[in-house]
Amino acid sequence: MKIFYIRHAPTMANINGDIVEDYDGQSIVFFDKDKWHEKVGSNLPKDFKLFISPAKRCKETAKALFPDKEYTVVQDLAEFDLSELNKSGHKFWEIDEETFNKYIFLPERSIINRWLNALGSMLCKCDSNDDTVVVIGHGFYGRLVNEIYENNDDSVFDILNSKNFSFGNLDMMEIDKRKVVNVWRY
């Protein structure tokens, strides 16, 4: 299975670095769809199955980028709840590892298991192992996939904070044969 993984379009919380209570209530903000299709989307094959996180911003991104395409929601692609970090009083990019670990318990193994469960769900919906899928999800999973395949040995905090790999809104990576083979930046 070849996977093209796209991070959802930006929200005001992304832009402002806000940690929000209601992750699924965030709507996307305007972005230039023509520019995205020219810089990023032109690298997609014509035929693919579309899978998305259940978050509102992922559904809105799917409808904006692929208005005529049906999609399947994959629960295991859901965002992780980091709202406890609100108690720190910081913007997301101001949080250090000690503060993160004080408020959040998020073992790397559980994150990897969710990604593997998501892959299993997607594979079950494909007609063959050779199908191409497009996934619209969260930046965290994009960075995690890079971590898994590049073996950087980063902590969960490092992955969240893009220590060795940045994956911005509307960026896309191609994953084939258990490695990241291309990354396109919006």
Where do the PLM segments sit?
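Beta-strand elements within well-structured catalytic alpha/beta cores of enzymes
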Residues: 2-6, 51, 130-141
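Glycine-rich phosphate-binding loop signature in dinucleotide/nucleotide-binding domains
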Residues: 43-46, 125-132
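Phosphate-handling substructures
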Residues: 20-31, 65-121, 161
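Active-site-proximal alpha-helix that buttresses catalytic centers in soluble enzyme cores
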Residues: 2-74, 103, 107, 168
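Residues at the C-termini of beta-strands that transition into short coil/loop
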Residues: 7, 74-77, 176, 184
